[in-house]
Design a protein with these regions (language model features):
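A detector for small-residue-rich transmembrane helices and their helix-helix packing motifs
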Residues: 1-230
Length: 230
């Protein structure tokens, strides 16, 4: 029954795609968020040309990290993606939530927050299965940190969301607390339903750790000048 619930939750996740925050607009162009999207696109092009060897070289291999080897991959892996759907899905989520968090933190603080969130999420995934020799990659953990920060900062904002149920497709509006909270619930149930080595390539612990990091540190990264002007 638990497996069935997990599958249903995962299906629901795929049917709710956040597009934008309809409750507010950032006060400036989200240059850092746009740069992150562009950098991920460039790296994905390099993956397509470099093949599996390129991906393996720059992905996190938990056993290597535990042994103190290839530590730079803790940073590089968060800019790699395994497929077109992987990168497109991640960048859509980032663009839905990133601009507002960049605005409230300031570009510099937001860039540091994003990178640290990505590192924390990668290390959490390593801790779950430290002996693994399977590559771990993707921006999902860092983006989960952004979502966790959004949950704390703007829980009541209305998120323009693409809702897909079978052949039924429509745009609707969902409160951020409901949308992000539901997403986090999916990650928790999914992590509990499968062993770390049988997660189908999905780093659920990285998602959970990223979201927790973002939620607990969001206020620390807020721009004090913006708050004073507030």
């Amino acid at each position: 029954m638990r497996d069935r619930l997990t599958r249903n939750l995962a299906l629901a996740r795929e049917e709710m795609v956040p597009l934008s925050d309809e409750s507010r607009r950032p006060s400036h162009f989200p240059a850092v968020t746009a740069s992150i999207v562009a950098l991920n696109a460039i790296v994905f092009f390099l993956e397509l040309t470099g093949g599996e060897a390129f991906v393996t070289q720059w992905s996190v291999i938990p056993a290597d990290i535990v042994s103190g080897r290839h530590l730079v991959t803790i940073l590089t892996a968060m800019f790699l993606h395994g497929s077109w759907s992987h990168i497109i899905g991640n960048m859509v989520f980032l663009w839905a939530f990133g601009p507002q968090i960049e605005d409230v933190m300031s570009p510099g603080r937001y860039a540091v927050f994003y990178l640290v969130g990505g590192v924390v999420s990668m290390l959490a995934q390593v801790a779950v299965d430290p002996a693994s020799t399977l590559p771990s990659l993707g921006a999902s953990g860092a983006i989960a940190a952004v979502m966790g920060a959004f949950l704390i900062t703007y829980p009541r904002d209305r998120i323009r969301t693409l809702l897909i149920i079978g052949f039924f497709v429509r745009i609707t509006f969902v409160p951020a607390a409901l949308l992000i909270g539901f997403w986090i619930l999916i990650q928790i149930f999914s992590f509990g339903a499968v062993a770390p080595t049988q997660s189908g390539g999905v780093a659920y612990m990285a998602h959970i750790a990223g979201a927790v990091f973002g939620a607990f540190t969001a206020r620390l990264f807020e721009d004090p000048d913006r708050l004073a002007a507030g």
